[in-house]
């Protein structure tokens, strides 16, 4: 990939515009989870250290384009960055027709989604953004799968377009896991529906040695294996699809193992009592919310012997502790494995935090949708743009 990396450039005195993913949860004007901000800080600090006049832009939430809405303002992010950085930080509301940016300070543009044409990748808007800088830095892997004015169009028109260290690191880690992985390659795909992750399952079943499915997705595979799933969340219309994916994996010497024991309850609630059952004993009234200890142990063994692990999605309703043991055991197995491991997606990162294994996972991806699209083998528009500008 012929992508220019920001770290290689001389930025002294240059106007540098960085697109970060600062889309963080905010409550009562305070940032409640700062993971994305912490991930973005090294890039911002590096640009400041290199003597640039640094401007940063991001979206936050889903406001109506063209309308200012205080609920989606980046002011709470500015407050956070002011404490995290040793330089002045200010919010710029009107910046499209020019903005003053000085070396030694950080200018944060107000929510890019307040601009009409952002989502449609409007060329006039992209050109206005490009005119504000000497160097455009795309560092937001979480939005690399969207061709929008601030993630794609601006890069086509800026004098120089490059990847920031965070984005470059994501691409390197994902490339290591997917392009030339140490074998066996094991992927864990959890989540509620097969339909939302069908293309990922399709793509992975053709390249991985073991594909572990969890959550509601696993229920469809349990049904496909001929077992009762009761009132569990599953997709009857995708049973044939599940059978085909299993056959596809097995034809390559791989497999999609189905749980042998499961944890069930009669209702979905934080106080529901958990019952352990053999998968053949599930009744029509049961709802499956987790894998049982035997299944978790078997999966742990697979993970222990893996060369590469890609994790996207929990294997149970881990938010409720009584249905979290399966995900906890998987998390521990990944932490104990010598494999190169990469974890991505919101629920997965919440599980990584809950079971405190962040420092034991080789790479934690900041992307949700972008992470999935990379696993599907899709071209990410922002990455394609950077490649075209790097040639």
Curated annotation (Swiss-Prot):
Top EC group: transferase
Highest rank taxon of the organism: Bacteria
Gene Ontology cellular-component annotations: cytosol
Compartments in which it is found: Cytoplasm
Keywords noted in UniProt: ATP-binding, Cytoplasm, Glycolysis, Kinase, Nucleotide-binding, Transferase
EC number: 2.7.2.3
Any one GO molecular function term: ATP binding
Binding residues for ATP: 197, 319, 345-348
Reaction(s) catalysed (UniProt annotation): (2R)-3-phosphoglycerate + ATP = (2R)-3-phospho-glyceroyl phosphate + ADP
Positions annotated to bind substrate: 21-23, 36, 59-62, 113, 146
Native source organism of the sequence: Shewanella sediminis (strain HAW-EB3)
Pfam families: PGK
Family: Belongs to the phosphoglycerate kinase family.
Pathway given in the UniProt record: Carbohydrate degradation; glycolysis; pyruvate from D-glyceraldehyde 3-phosphate: step 2/5
Signal peptide span: none
Major location (coarse): cytoplasm
GO biological processes: gluconeogenesis; glycolytic process
The protein's assembly and partners: Monomer.
Entry protein name: Phosphoglycerate kinase
PROSITE patterns on file: PGLYCERATE_KINASE
Gene name per UniProt: pgk
